[in-house]
């Protein structure tokens, strides 16, 4: 199962990944921050979780520091974490759609 979202939808995806790490093959986070309140499970439960974090370097609503925090947390937990920073604001574009597509195909083809 793969889940993901943009902005607030991605915050929900973060929350689900933190609560149920072994339920998902992959999580796609686009332009989001970690939930305000969250807890983590035993780190070994995250080792098979794949996470793609995408953030716009020109996002005026959510600074890239939020993306870096999410990246650092999931790396610390041992998840397979990929980060991509696009030269966009708080939006999606063909570049980010393409990145998501490539990431998903690479995992499905394993």
Model feature map: region roles:
Residues 32-51:
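Flexible "cap/lid" loop of the alpha/beta hydrolase fold
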Residues 4, 28-31, 54, 86:
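Alpha/beta-hydrolase-fold catalytic nucleophile elbow
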Residues 4-9, 13:
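Gly/Ala-rich beta-loop-alpha elbow adjacent to hydrolase catalytic centers
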Residues 40, 64-65:
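Conserved catalytic-core motifs of eukaryotic protein kinase domains, centered on the activation segment
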Residues 52-55, 59:
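Short beta-strand/loop motif that positions the catalytic acidic residue
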Residues 15-19:
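Active-site signature of alpha/beta-hydrolase-fold catalytic machinery across serine-
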């Amino acid at each position: 199962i793969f889940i993901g979202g943009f902005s607030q939808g991605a915050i929900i995806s973060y929350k689900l990944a933190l609560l149920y790490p072994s339920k998902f093959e992959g999580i796609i986070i686009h332009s989001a921050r970690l939930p305000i309140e969250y807890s983590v499970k035993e780190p070994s439960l995250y080792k098979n979780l794949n996470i793609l974090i995408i953030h716009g370097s020109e996002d005026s609503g959510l600074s890239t520091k939020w993306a870096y925090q999410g990246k650092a947390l999931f790396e610390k937990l041992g998840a397979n974490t990929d980060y991509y920073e696009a030269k966009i604001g708080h939006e999606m574009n063909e570049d980010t759609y393409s990145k998501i597509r490539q990431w998903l195909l690479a995992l499905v083809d394993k």
